[in-house]
A protein has these predicted regions:
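Conserved, well-structured ligand/cofactor-binding cores
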Residues: 1-159
Length: 159
């Protein structure tokens, strides 16, 4: 597909850069909650792949560390894509794979992770994007709806 120039200070790679350059639609970026959910998903997949004997322990540990950086929000600047993209979320899945692979390689001090071979192992964009949406929805319910319902209940009881 040709060479792509990616800013040196970014963890994303060619697939994300192509999407960023070719699909500048609107100003809305992928919601933080979805990005964090992708981190949770990729961490869980690494643990599952390790438990299945498909991924060695060093790679699993490095993927988990890099995914934790995504989950914590430290790497939000490395997720530049618009929310408006294909229905399967392929661009966001690849953005997550590339960021976690490149951050993981930095953590490891050597190139041991590949976005497709290790971060996306046993996964498909058709599955990861809806799964990330479900994770984000569940977290929002837990973090926002339940506390609001508790507050409403207490307010009504006090009335």
């Amino acid at each position: 597909m040709g060479e792509m120039q990616v800013p040196a200070d970014r963890y994303w790679a060619a697939q994300t850069q192509r999407s960023y350059q070719n699909f500048k639609i609107g100003i809305e970026k992928m919601p933080t909650e979805i990005v964090h959910a992708f981190g949770i998903l990729k961490k869980g997949a690494a643990i599952a792949n390790f438990n299945l004997g498909k991924l060695d322990e060093e790679r699993k540990n490095v993927i988990c560390q890099a995914a934790d950086d995504v989950i914590s929000g430290k790497l939000m600047d490395h997720f530049p894509l618009a929310v408006w993209q294909t229905g399967s979320g392929t661009q966001s899945n690849m953005n997550s794979n590339e960021v976690i692979a490149n951050r993981g390689n930095e953590i490891a001090g050597k190139k041991i992770l590949h976005p497709n071979d290790h971060i996306n192992m046993s996964q498909s964009s058709n599955d990861t994007f809806p799964t990330a949406l479900h994770i984000a929805a569940a977290m929002s319910i837990e973090d926002n709806l339940f506390p609001a319902m508790d507050k409403l209940t207490e307010t009504l009881k006090a009335s």
